[in-house]
Amino acid sequence: MKIRYQGKETETGADTVAAFLATQGVDAAEGVVELDGEIVAGDAVAATSLHEGAELNAFRIVAGG
């Protein structure tokens, strides 16, 4: 299926947000995941299904001083 990830069209066979992020080397626990304009929180990442045309973004949280 085709989705938009970080603003770019991407082809994937992953069926969940977590499975797709794993193919991209992204650990959802280290940031914030947004699917179709809504935040996907915590454990919901593993249970949330992807669909054709989904818009997915992942933001890494960086802190320091």
Summary of predicted features, one role per range:
Residues 1-64:
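Ubiquitin-like/PB1-type beta-grasp interaction modules and other compact soluble beta-rich domains
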